[in-house]
Amino acid sequence: TIMLDAGHGGEDPGAVFQGRQEKDDNLKLTLAVGEKLQDNGVDVLYTRTEDVYQTPFEKAQIANEAKPDYFISFHRNSSPDANQYAGAEVLVYDKSGIKYEMAQNILGALGEAGFDELGVKERPGLVVLRRTKMPAILVEAGFLNTEGDNEIFDNNFNMIVDGIANAILGTLDMETVEEEPMYYRVQVGAFRSRENADKLLYELLDQDYPAFLLHDNGLYRVQV
């Protein structure tokens, strides 16, 4: 399970530039990445799906109560002067563990989508990184007050979403491989009909097999 957080919200717009508000970009990106992860079978939770205000402490508390495996917060950066800086960066509490791997993978994906890569940086003072009890990262998807970064964000939006989602999925796959090196699944049936797939699934579960259902390319696949 992954919890996604759209930074800011409600009365807190985050960065603002020429009528553009960071909170809106954050939510758009968060929901799009979440949908892509869900399409790939990941359980996704959100701190917010609407334009509501939460303090960083509340966001961390929501995560700690939900107990996801990872917490990823999406933001846009800003600089004192317009068009002063450009690029994407990913922030972590410290450079250790799976969160650091995921942060590097996401940064690489943002680079491929057109942003300058400003690096993975330690920010132990940030509440959503310090107060969360699970691996947590904060993504800064370009500078909101830099026109070139906004062009990348708008024109390459789907590439950004796909890249971030694939970076997350790739990191999860890596972790699974590391944890379960000798783990194989066997497909026992593929059906066009959900009803037939469910029937086999329940029969296997009744016999205590760890069976589950996948859906892809119009087929329901039962695996153990």
Predicted regions and their residues:
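Short glycine-rich His-centered loop
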Residues: 1-19
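Short beta-strand motif preference
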Residues: 4, 137-139, 222
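Short glycine-centered, acidic/aromatic-flanked micro-motifs in structured strand/loop junctions
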Residues: 6, 48-49, 92, 188-190, ...
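Short, small-residue-rich loop/turn micro-motifs
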Residues: 6-8, 75-78, 140-143, 190, ...
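A short acidic, helix-capping loop that chelates divalent metal ions and anchors anionic groups
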Residues: 12-14, 147-148, 221
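Periplasmic OmpA-like peptidoglycan-binding domain that tethers envelope proteins to the cell wall
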Residues: 16-23, 224
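Active-site-proximal helix/loop segments of hydrolytic enzymes
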Residues: 20, 24-180
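Solvent-exposed beta-strand motifs enriched in subsets of small alpha/beta binding domains
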Residues: 179-224
